């Protein structure tokens, strides 16, 4: 829209299927770039137009140790930025299985420790921000309008092959513009 990539989440809550036998789950709107990287810099202009979250995500679809090959992501909300190592944390298949067993709650918490970090920010609806996500080895940094706002060092970030970069929008609409990606040495 107007030269920008607009994402709109069309289903914001889980709903029963028409036959009532299953549930259709809400999911963020996602645009994937088939762009292999290891160490990279992703720069994008983000604009919140009713959405609650926008993100830059790194995946490896051939990796089976995490759901859908999710590796890491930087989530930006109006009040916070969260960096997640999904390979070792929330999307790790072993951890997802352990979460189904209430007796494993302590073990899940132990394994999840250090796989995400959240930092406060103050952003405004309708404003455009330049967001830069840098991954080098097992470290990810996020800056907004030239100011460093978030950092995480965790093993999954250093995954050898990130075959896909995804841009996501949750909770209605948001826009990405001037998308730039550099592979770092």
State where each predicted segment sits.
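Extracellular/lumenal ectodomain signal focusing on beta-strand-rich modules
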Residues: 2, 39, 151, 177-178
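Beta-strand-rich interaction surfaces with strong enrichment in secreted/lumenal proteins
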Residues: 28-35, 117-123, 165-166
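Short tryptophan-centered beta-strand motifs in secreted/extracellular beta-sheet-rich domains
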Residues: 42-44, 126-144
């Amino acid at each position: 829209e107007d030269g920008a990539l607009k994402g709109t989440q069309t289903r914001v809550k889980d709903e029963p299927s028409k036959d009532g036998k299953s549930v259709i789950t809400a999911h963020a709107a996602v645009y994937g770039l088939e762009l292999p990287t290891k160490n990279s810099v992703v720069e994008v202009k983000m604009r919140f137009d009713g959405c609650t979250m926008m993100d830059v995500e790194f995946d490896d679809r051939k990796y089976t140790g995490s759901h859908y090959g999710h590796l890491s992501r930087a989530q930006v909300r109006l009040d916070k930025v969260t960096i997640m190592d999904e390979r070792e944390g929330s999307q790790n298949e072993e951890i997802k299985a352990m979460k189904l067993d209430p007796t494993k709650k302590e073990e899940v918490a132990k394994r999840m420790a250090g796989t995400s970090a959240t930092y406060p920010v103050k952003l405004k609806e309708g404003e455009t921000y330049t967001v830069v996500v840098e991954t080098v080895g097992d470290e990810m940094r996020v800056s907004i309008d030239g100011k460093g706002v978030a950092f995480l060092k965790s093993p999954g970030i250093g995954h050898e092959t990130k075959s896909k970069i995804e841009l996501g929008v949750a909770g209605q609409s948001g826009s990405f513009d001037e998308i730039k990606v550099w592979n770092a040495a």
